[in-house]
């Protein structure tokens, strides 16, 4: 199959380059005790890549509710939703967390923080 014949979107990568880059990141983190790597999965969107980037279902970063659900379903329970949360998405995050996951959220907006605090 030719590259241009692949159905899109699809993930195409050089596995050797990926593994080399992941090893470089791990080496850099290892030089700083206490530092924890939390790779962002928004580009790869792949459990196979997550298994290499965050072995043993380590912590990851996501940027959509769909990614949070997908990776939680694959055993990645410790996540940061790295986009400022909106009140409309709190129910979805709560539902994911109700299944034993720990998707952390961020905000820099006082009104949203109040909505988070008031959310059941």
Sequence positions of predicted segments:
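N-terminal glycine-rich anion-binding loops that anchor highly charged ligand groups
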Residues: 17-47, 63
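Generic N-terminal amphipathic, Lys/Arg-enriched alpha-helix
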Residues: 1-13
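A short, structure-level motif marking secondary-structure boundaries and short turns
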Residues: 9-11, 33-35, 51-54
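Active-site-proximal beta-alpha core segment in soluble small-molecule metabolic enzymes
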Residues: 38-120
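Generic preference for hydrophobic/aromatic residues in regular secondary structure cores
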Residues: 11-12, 22, 103
């Amino acid at each position: 199959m030719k590259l241009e014949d692949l159905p899109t979107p699809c993930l195409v990568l050089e596995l050797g380059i990926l593994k080399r880059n992941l090893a470089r990141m791990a080496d850099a983190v290892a030089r700083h005790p206490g530092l924890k790597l939390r790779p962002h999965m928004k580009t790869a969107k792949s459990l196979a890549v997550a298994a290499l980037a965050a072995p043993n279902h380590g912590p990851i970063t996501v940027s959509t509710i769909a990614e949070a659900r997908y990776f939680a379903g694959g055993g990645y329970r410790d996540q940061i939703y790295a986009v400022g949360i909106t009140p409309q998405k709190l129910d979805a995050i709560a539902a994911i967390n109700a299944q034993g996951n720990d998707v952390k959220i961020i905000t820099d907006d006082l009104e949203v923080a109040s909505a988070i605090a008031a959310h059941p």
